[in-house]
Amino acid sequence: MTDTTSKTTAIQLLRAYHDNIQNPDEAAALFADDGVVELPTVKARAQGREAIRGLVQGLLKKIPGFRFKNTQVWIETPDKVFAEYSVEALVPDTGKIYKQTYAGVLIAEGGRIKLLREALDTAEAARAFSKD
């Protein structure tokens, strides 16, 4: 399990989440016991480490090469960070490239992620996953 302490900042947690997105166990371990990932624009929500692990596993099944890159931090405090970051990866089921920019806010509490809320372009997601 990933070692975090109460001194771990929000930006450190966001970077660790991005660095570990290919490892669902490590990504989920960054969250508080009752931590939440929300993607309101696609009506997705996972609460608790097991649910978050499952969300990441499901994502990687659909987009095996999913990795965050080009993180631009806009607002940063010790317990909150707002950033934009991108993903560009193949969707094997459609043969299309999933090219997306996310806007995310992360709230840290006790050295863990309490909330990660992300927004994304739903039209781009629909295009990448459409089989036409």
Regions found by a protein language model. Give the residues of each.
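Short, low-complexity N-terminal intrinsically disordered segments enriched in polar/charged residues
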Residues: M1-A29, D33, D132
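A beta-strand edge to alpha-helix "cap/lid" segment located at domain peripheries
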Residues: T2-T5, L60-D132
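Residues at secondary-structure transition points
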Residues: T4-T8, A46-E50, I97
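Short, mixed-charge, low-aromatic patches
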Residues: K7-A16, L39-R45, L59-P64, F82-S86
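Hydrophobic alpha-helical core bundles mediating ligand binding, dimerization, or RNAP-core interactions
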Residues: L14, H18-I21, F31, V56, ...
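Hydrophobic pocket/interface hotspot
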Residues: Y17, E26-A28, G35, G48, ...
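A solvent-exposed, acidic/Ser-Thr-rich amphipathic alpha-helical stretch
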Residues: P24, A28-T77
